[in-house]
C-alpha cells in the first residue's frame, strides 16, 4: 500500500510541469497566506505516527499569534460536529468555531479572522448577530465561511438532517441564507420570504463596522455558481504531492463562473506543508506519517463520501476520500526543504485566479515558525512584506 502510494506520487510529480516565471510587482501582492487552525484533535493528519493532541484555546491562541507575527493574512477555523473514530479518534474532539474565533479576535490585532457557520444548525439571523459581535471585538477583521453540510451523521445525531434530497438543494438553501445575512448586515432589517426562510421584520443591530466578507469552499458546479454570486473568495483543495499547480483547472472553473456574474472571486488553495532542512528529511517525515495511517478512520471517511450521489464527482468530500493520499484527506501536500517549499508556493502564485493559500502543518507551532523564518523570506510572492521587528513567544 505504502509503495503504491509513493509510486502514484512520483508519477504525479513527473507529469507536472516545472514552471519558470518572474512575478510582476502587482502579482506579488496577490499571494495571501492563511492558517487553517486545528480546531479538531490532531490537525489534518489521520495517522498514529503524527503528533497527537487535543484542541485547546491556548494552542490555537499560540498558533494565531505566531502567524500574526509572521505576517500571515488570515486565520480560519472549520466546524466539525462528529469525527471519524478509529485508533486516533480523528476529529472526535472539536471546539466550536465562532466562540473560538471570538476569543482569538480579542488576543490579536492585525490578522483577519474567519469562523465557519454550519448553516443547518444556526439560523441566519443568529449568525448575523454573532458576526456583528465579533466584528466589534476584532475592529472589523472578521468574516464568515458558510458550509452547507455534507457529513450526514453530524446532523442526524441531533435530529436535524433534512433528508437526502438536501444534497441536491443545499445551495438553494445557502442562497436564501446569505440573502438574509446580506439584508441584516446591510440595513439591519429583513423581510425575506423564500422556500427555506421567512423573515418578518427581523432586526439586527448594531451592524458590522465594515462590509462583512463571506467565503465558501465549493468545488461542485453548484458550489462554484454560489461563490461566483455571493462569495468574496472561494477555497479549493490543492491536488497531489509536490504538484503545486495541479489545482489550476479548478481555479479556471472558478474564474469562468465569476466572469458570468461580473464579479472578481479568487481562489484560495489548501495545502499542507511538511518541510525540513533537506528534501530527503521532509520526505522521510511524510513516509512515516503514511506508514501510520489510521485505516479505520479512513474507511469511515470513504463510506461517508459515497452518501452524496447528487452533487457530481468533483466535490471536496470525494477528493478527501481518494486513496492516493488519504492520510491528510488529500489536500495538496508540499513536501521538501525550505527552499523547495518556497519555490512550490511561488508556483502556486503563478496560477491565474489563485489569490492565496490556506496552510496546515504537520506540527503547527514549529511549522509556522519555520515558515516565517525559513520559507517565506525565499518566496518572491511575499517579497513585499516588511522585516520582522517584534519578538514572538
From Swiss-Prot:
Reactions catalysed according to its record: uracil + FMNH2 + NADH + O2 = (Z)-3-ureidoacrylate + FMN + NAD(+) + H2O + H(+); thymine + FMNH2 + NADH + O2 = (Z)-2-methylureidoacrylate + FMN + NAD(+) + H2O + H(+)
Listed GO biological process terms: alkanesulfonate catabolic process; nitrogen utilization; uracil catabolic process
EC number: 1.14.99.46
InterPro entries: Luciferase-like_dom, Luciferase-like_sf, Pyrimidine_monooxygenase_RutA, SsuD_RutA_monooxygenase
Keywords: Flavoprotein, FMN, Monooxygenase, NADP, Oxidoreductase
Binding site for FMN: 79-80, 145, 154, 170-171, 220
HAMAP family on file: RutA (MF_01699)
Family according to the record: Belongs to the NtaA/SnaA/DszA monooxygenase family. RutA subfamily.
Function statement: The FMN-N(5)-oxide reacts spontaneously with NADH to produce FMN. Requires the flavin reductase RutF to regenerate FMN in vivo.
Protein name listed in UniProt: Pyrimidine monooxygenase RutA
Higher taxonomy: Bacteria, Pseudomonadati, Pseudomonadota, Gammaproteobacteria, Enterobacterales
Amino acid at each position: 500500500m505504502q509503495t503504491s502510494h509513493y509510486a502514484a506520487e512520483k508519477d504525479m510529480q513527473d507529469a507536472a510541469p516545472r514552471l519558470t516565471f518572474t512575478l510582476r510587482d502587482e502579482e506579488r501582492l496577490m499571494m495571501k497566506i492563511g492558517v487553517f487552525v486545528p480546531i479538531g484533535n490532531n490537525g489534518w493528519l489521520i495517522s498514529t505516527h503524527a503528533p497527537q493532541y487535543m484542541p485547546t484555546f491556548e494552542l490555537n491562541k499560540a498558533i494565531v499569534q505566531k502567524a500574526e507575527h509572521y505576517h500571515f493574512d488570515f486565520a480560519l477555523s472549520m466546524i466539525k460536529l462528529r469525527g471519524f473514530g478509529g485508533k486516533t479518534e480523528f476529529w472526535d474532539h472539536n471546539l466550536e468555531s465562532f466562540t473560538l474565533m471570538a476569543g482569538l479576535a480579542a488576543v490579536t490585532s492585525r490578522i483577519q479572522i474567519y469562523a465557519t457557520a454550519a448553516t443547518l444548525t444556526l439560523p441566519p439571523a443568529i449568525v448575523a448577530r454573532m458576526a456583528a459581535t465579533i466584528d466589534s471585538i476584532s475592529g472589523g477583521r472578521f468574516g464568515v465561511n458558510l458550509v452547507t453540510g455534507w457529513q450526514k451523521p453530524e446532523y442526524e445525531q441531533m435530529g436535524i438532517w433534512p433528508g437526502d434530497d438536501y444534497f441536491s438543494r443545499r445551495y438553494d438553501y445557502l442562497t436564501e441564507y446569505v440573502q438574509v445575512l446580506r439584508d441584516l448586515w446591510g440595513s439591519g432589517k429583513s423581510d425575506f420570504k423564500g422556500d427555506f426562510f421567512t423573515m418578518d421584520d427581523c432586526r439586527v443591530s448594531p451592524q458590522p463596522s465594515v462590509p462583512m466578507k463571506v467565503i465558501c469552499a465549493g468545488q461542485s458546479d453548484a458550489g462554484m455558481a454560489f461563490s461566483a454570486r455571493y462569495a468574496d473568495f472561494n477555497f479549493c483543495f490543492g491536488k497531489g504531492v509536490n504538484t503545486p499547480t495541479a489545482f489550476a483547472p479548478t481555479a479556471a472553473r472558478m474564474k469562468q463562473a465569476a466572469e458570468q456574474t461580473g464579479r472578481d472571486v479568487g481562489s484560495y488553495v489548501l495545502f499542507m506543508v511538511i518541510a525540513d532542512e533537506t528534501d530527503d528529511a521532509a520526505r522521510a517525515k511524510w513516509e512515516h506519517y503514511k506508514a501510520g495511517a489510521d485505516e479505520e478512520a479512513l474507511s469511515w471517511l470513504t463510506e461517508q463520501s459515497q452518501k452524496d450521489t447528487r452533487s457530481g464527482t468533483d466535490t471536496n468530500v470525494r477528493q478527501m476520500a481518494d486513496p492516493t493520499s488519504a492520510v491528510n484527506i488529500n489536500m495538496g501536500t508540499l513536501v521538501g526543504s525550505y527552499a523547495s517549499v518556497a519555490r512550490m508556493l511561488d508556483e502556486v502564485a503563478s496560477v491565474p485566479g489563485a489569490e492565496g493559500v490556506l496552510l496546515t502543518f504537520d506540527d503547527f507551532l514549529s511549522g509556522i515558525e519555520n515558515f516565517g523564518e525559513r520559507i517565506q523570506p525565499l518566496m518572491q510572492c511575499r517579497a513585499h512584506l516588511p522585516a520582522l521587528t517584534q519578538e514572538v513567544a
